[in-house]
């Protein structure tokens, strides 16, 4: 299988050195391995610009969705009510999880190309005093829109509610101070902006809030409190952990620091995104999200014309060494291009040249 450049929001292109960390086998009970887990937990707090004992980090096996569900099942009690803010498929997935868990919920939904309003969140909290928790996706990779978690967080905090943020595709790539943002549970995954590989996610939680969650989970494997209770002692996971993935993630964290930290990575991602948007605009590709609402993570593009075949376009990009993403909208034809991972200006320039040549050939055919 060819080694493609993955222009996706994760899994993504990783460095050779991150991959090499997975060549060694490790024992889950070994003290050296458990220490790796503890170091990772501390480094995650550093990235979030918070520290112990006010905050704590918990690693959880599975994809990002597993970790989101672990927070919902653990943090939202039987007598609580959850307000879920949605403007994309991943917010809607949180709604689906909440319904399966039979949580009391309120849904505030806005169109996919619009940001939710903090004023509307305020109105909803004023109207329904029984709401105890508020959940929102930071970077909604359905479209690439970046939601205003600072403004929403200030409202949630003013009402003394618990704030849950799905920062799956932003944490580590967009600067975040969890305390300043009033986030109580921040959720992300190994295979996103920190540039590890799939296999586990993590939660950075306010310690005093997590401590109140004992016995609330409706799941054994996804009980975030119980996972934390065991892990905080010496780095042991309750159940078998993805040892190779953990080792790769530890290396990815080292490389994030070497790059200059989150601010430097954010700038690289933003530069990649600006280059992509400017060059594709000249070629007639219109972005679905306006520039001021666009995240530096992934961009959704409208098909340039009715005859455009995404399948053919996708295969031609793949032949040239690039893998892109299909669209996730139901009402309009789109595709997506990510620019995170081990991707640099020269990669984006090369991609744009391939797209330009493709469009020239197709235009000549017509």
Curated annotation (Swiss-Prot):
Q: Which reaction does it catalyse?
A: (2-aminoethyl)phosphonate + pyruvate = phosphonoacetaldehyde + L-alanine
GO molecular function terms here?
Answer: 2-aminoethylphosphonate-pyruvate transaminase activity
> Has UniProt tagged this entry with the keyword Nucleotide-binding?
no
Does the UniProt entry include the keyword GTP-binding?
A: no
Biological process (GO), any one = organic phosphonate catabolic process
Which cofactor(s) are needed, names only?
Answer: pyridoxal 5'-phosphate
Query: List-wise, which residues carry N6-(pyridoxal phosphate)lysine?
Result: 192
Q: Which domain of life is it from?
A: Bacteria
Assigned keywords, A-Z: Aminotransferase, Pyridoxal phosphate, Pyruvate, Transferase
Under Enzyme Commission nomenclature, its number is 2.6.1.37
Cleaved signal peptide residues: none
Q: Which family does it belong to?
A: Belongs to the class-V pyridoxal-phosphate-dependent aminotransferase family. PhnW subfamily.
The free-text function statement in the UniProt record for this protein reads: Involved in phosphonate degradation.
Subunit architecture? Homodimer.
User: What HAMAP family does this protein's entry cite?
Assistant: PhnW_aminotrans_5 (MF_01376)
**Protein name, entry field:** 2-aminoethylphosphonate--pyruvate transaminase
Say which species the protein is native to.
Answer: Lysinibacillus sphaericus (strain C3-41)
Q: What is the lineage of its organism?
A: Bacteria, Bacillati, Bacillota, Bacilli, Bacillales
Gene giving rise to this polypeptide:
phnW
